[in-house]
Amino acid sequence: MRVKETVRELHPCFGQARNKGRIHLPVCPACNIECNFCDRKRNTYENRPGVTGAILSPEEAVDALKKALELCPEITVAGIAGPGDTLASDGAIKTFQLIKEHYPDLLKCMSTNGLLLKERADELIELGIDTLTVTVNAVDPKIQAKIISGIYYHGKRYEGEEAAKILIENQLEGIRRIAAAGITVKVNTVLIMEINRYHIKEIAKAVREAGATMYNIIPLIPQHKLKACKEPECKDIDGARCE
């Protein structure tokens, strides 16, 4: 499946839209996965994934979007990526419903860990999400179990390979459903040299077969339980991408 022409023209992350802008709206407070590399915080001095200065309500987010568009009319994409997971609460869905109502021409871009993607795919399809990014760090439960400590799924906490199997199954089936609806799907993988460096090819193959259009490898920021791991260098990322 190819990237839609509209997405290519208007989304700076998916094509040649270098003069277009995007805004990320922090409306998701909760997360349902304990990633060993994630240290979520609320402050105004760190600039990394998992950190935000505040959590907005859907109404506050749309108000912020309105002000941003007044200052920067080049914005063509409204994105929601956290700071928690976008499907672990209803903040993202409600925000996109308001954006669809008030700013129907904006692209709606969402990121998720994919744990609830299989069961909430129909909501996203009905909502008219334009692009979806799913973080898939392994498709082998033994490897995934080294990356996450556990998941919270339907009111119960799962650990180890049991948690990993649930996550992987839901991610891949969710991608299949979203891609089958014609939505552009990108997959991100956090490159962890000590854990999934030689697993990249298998991940890429699995997500491609599920329907993902783009595959992106991003470097680990060593922190939290993986703070002793090596930070990947450019040559490491290039090597993984060439496999």
What is each residue range found by the language model?
Residues 1-19, 201-243:
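Auxiliary Fe-S-binding modules of radical SAM enzymes
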Residues 45-48, 142-145, 155-157, 223-228:
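A short acidic, helix-capping loop that chelates divalent metal ions and anchors anionic groups
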Residues 60-81:
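Short Fe-S-cluster ligation motifs
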Residues 48-55, 148-151, 160-161, 229-233:
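Short glycine-enriched, charge-decorated loop/helix-capping segments at active-site entrances
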Residues 26, 79-81, 186, 190:
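Conserved beta-strand segments that form the floor/walls of ligand-binding pockets within enzyme
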Residues 87-218:
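Conserved AdoMet/S-adenosylmethionine-binding subsite of the radical SAM
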